[in-house]
């Protein structure tokens, strides 16, 4: 507890608003340049290239170096925890902390981009590039909001803050969040923390998150019609792309929306058979490469996506391109991909706080002679992760395969009427003139990993963006510059309001 934190003489709202306006006017181009520095780093996890000081691969390591350099240049005390995580402090009157955590790792770019994914493109008031909204752009904006308070102190417009303000740079959010597990094993939790990695106005709870890997029986290549099958880029995204190489037989390949078929010439067919481990001379060579193009979407909001894996499997099944040894497995995956609410696999349920369960078949691959499929389920309080797993495990076994649970995080809720949530909400409403209410979501952010935390903006999904602006985890990821400017204002106001609470 910080004594007299509520009595600390803070700047008036009028002065703070003036300082915010001036900072945006003088430093907006600096903010965009800092976002671009991070977007230029393809900072997705690559464990095959992990090394000492770079436990998640070279991309996250390089992004962390850049972020810590930014913080150091602003005058903060920057620290690197062996590449697992980094943090920067604005020292307060107490060692007790208020925290902000953003992540600077990303999912891979994937196909389908019309803009360069690893640099910021500015077009008609929007920034485009991998990470501009998830979560490099918001992280840079929040770091600059922290810098605003530092500059106000240097200019004699703000006192030393009652809490130490800590910005934590995460680099493993998109996969296992091992970065925050490492951080919490070595540091105490802040008294309260928010993460700019969700939507406004403020999220006070997150659904449970279940991940698993479904694996088919090992079918000898000579008995398979499907020689290869792959799709998606991440477990936590509706797959926007999928591709298979199949024995074509006498199939005439009827036209279908989103499906492209390429008959392989003799050379490519022989190469495909060799890659699959088949004897080219012993098997007919009429092969086809079939590609499905759907629409990617984050697994927390899958309703707007179209599963390319589901499209591709449906086409294969409808046209007799699946062998008997593979049929049960592909039929099972097709059921999972057929509906995002779990109704096709008897998992549909909901509750008052979280709404309905969602399910996504995210990434498909080959493992030896087996097919594999990741599954992402976001579940409310009316079902448990164990119950979800039991249902999916039974489906896998019935198809002759297995289902291995790889993650299960229970739902979490904060009191929406508590002082911290209300402070965040008040900052949002002050900046926007709205009378918004807190909400819950299916997304999984760092907030669930800490003892007292909330996810807080900056997305506003009810605002329409041009059709060429994509969402997080999809191609042409984009964000409006005005939205980020508004987020800067909200975060700057929030720091002031939280500092006046007895947490």
What are these regions (language model features)?
Residues 2-99, 106-109, 374, 483-486:
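N-terminal helical capping/dimerization or prosegment-like subdomains
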Residues 135-219, 341-353, 503:
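Acidic/histidine-rich catalytic neighborhood of metal-dependent amide-processing enzymes
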Residues 52, 331-338, 360-365, 376-381, ...:
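A short beta-alpha structural unit
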Residues 144-151, 313-320, 493-496:
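Short glycine/serine- and small hydrophobic-enriched flexible loop segments
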Residues 23, 42, 367, 427-428, ...:
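Zn-dependent metallopeptidase/amidohydrolase metal-coordination segment
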Residues 244, 288-294, 371-377, 405-407:
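Short, hydrophobic beta-strand segments
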Residues 96-169, 175, 470-482:
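Active-site metal-coordination/substrate-binding segment of hydrolases
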Residues 204-230, 235-295, 299-362, 383-400:
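Acidic-enriched catalytic cores of C-N bond-cleaving enzymes acting on peptides and small amides
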